[in-house]
Amino acid sequence: MPIENQSRPRWAVLGGGMLGLATARRLMQRGDSVTIFESGNTLGGLTSAWQIGDVTWDRYYHVTLLSDLHLRELLRELKLDEDMEWVQTRTGFYSNGKLHSLSSSIEFLKFPVLNLYQKFRLGSTIFFGSKLRDWEKLEKISVESWLRRWSGNSTFEKIWEPLLKCKLGDAYKRTNAAFIWAYIQRMYAARRSGMKREMFGYVRGGYARVLKEFATYLASHGVSTCSDSTVTNVTQSSDQQWHVQYQSGGQEQTQSFDGVIATIPSPSILKIVDGLSQNESNRLRQTEYLGVVCTSLLLKKPLGGYYVTNITDPGFPLTGVIEMGTILKPDQLNGHYLVYLPKYVMSDDAAFDEPDDSIHERCLSTLERMYPHFQRDQVHAIQTAKAKHVMALPKLDYSNQRCPVAAERKGLFLLNSARIVDGTLNVNEVLRLVESEIAAIQLSSRA
């Protein structure tokens, strides 16, 4: 419970996504006063829900792993852990114009795209990557050179390069090897913790329910939330107080705080925070972001039966096919099957200006090409979400290019997802980031 004390530090948390909520949670739990500012009318950011057809579910695809210990701890705190559903999933590959299952060792050995030696090189690369712990060294090597070295040129060109292009576009050539290492580590996390096999899960009701319970929990412990409030300026006065100016309900308002924690993307920090040093501004400006254009479909029938289908054939406008219907019980979607069709692009890509109708036509044509049994009359609803700043591009030596969490001005902290260097971007990793940094913020704020 928060400490009722007039002298307790007053914090403004910029951003009501999962990172901002988790930061507010830890500040509140140590007795600080917290106000969250969120420009949207709902909390959650990339984890927020929306309505598609007659179903309310996650705007972007998310899944919980058994090995996601930080997320599972939060769900226990919110009393949602008993409402988890766990399933085993299947993985597919679309290669050489056909769907292939790679959900077991036997299926991997039968995979026709690679010969036995290439499969050995691929398997050895993944196994070797799972044993590595020194991600700092991998940061100084390009992902292409590392994968070519361990998997060989032919395996790289048949498997790794198409997957990297789907996820990163041509930017994969500037990406460090710790990027793929982090994915391998997440794949093997369950085995390292003693589990025989990874399980995928979700909370009944999706992130709409998680966020509702999280917001209620924070409010009941004294955290204030300013939703639908666009922060326009953050300044520090001579008395070292921080002043947050924001627009809400058509009016300009200001609140004052002892400290500010910015959990928003780097371009947004640059836009609204005054007084950043030249070094801080340069580092924030050099952060490149990947965004996503993600089309959701509610179908009357399932597609291929794989949770994720990776695409290695050229010329497909998708990063992959995510069939949430393979995980969710039918009653969660009113008997429908939810499919996500994401496409990751750089934040300045023209895809963000493309009309939704054009995107939908391309997605439907792609499904017709991949799944001969698919018919357009099976689509109950279709709509597209776009986010320009999803993941910072992990370039060579990326960890040394970031801003420190503690800014040069006392009381200002820069804690956004661009700080993640040794993990993939997911909710559990965001929570882990907060756990690793919150103590330093506390010490710095009381220095």
Summary of predicted features, one role per range:
Residues 28-52:
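Glycine-rich FAD pyrophosphate-binding loop
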Residues 53-135, 162:
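Dinucleotide-binding Rossmann-like beta1-alpha1 core, especially the glycine-rich loop
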Residues 19, 42, 267:
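Conserved Rossmann-like nucleotide-cofactor binding loop
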Residues 6, 114, 124-234, 242, ...:
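Active-site/ligand-binding neighborhood in enzyme catalytic cores
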Residues 339-340, 404-423, 429-433:
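Short FAD-binding loop at a beta-strand-to-alpha-helix junction that anchors the flavin cofactor
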Residues 430-447:
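Internal hydrophobic alpha-helix adjacent to the cofactor/substrate pocket in enzyme cavities
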Residues 9-36:
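N-terminal Rossmann-like FAD-binding beta1-loop-alpha1 element of flavoenzymes
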Residues 30, 230-339, 343-353, 357, ...:
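Mid-domain catalytic core of redox enzymes
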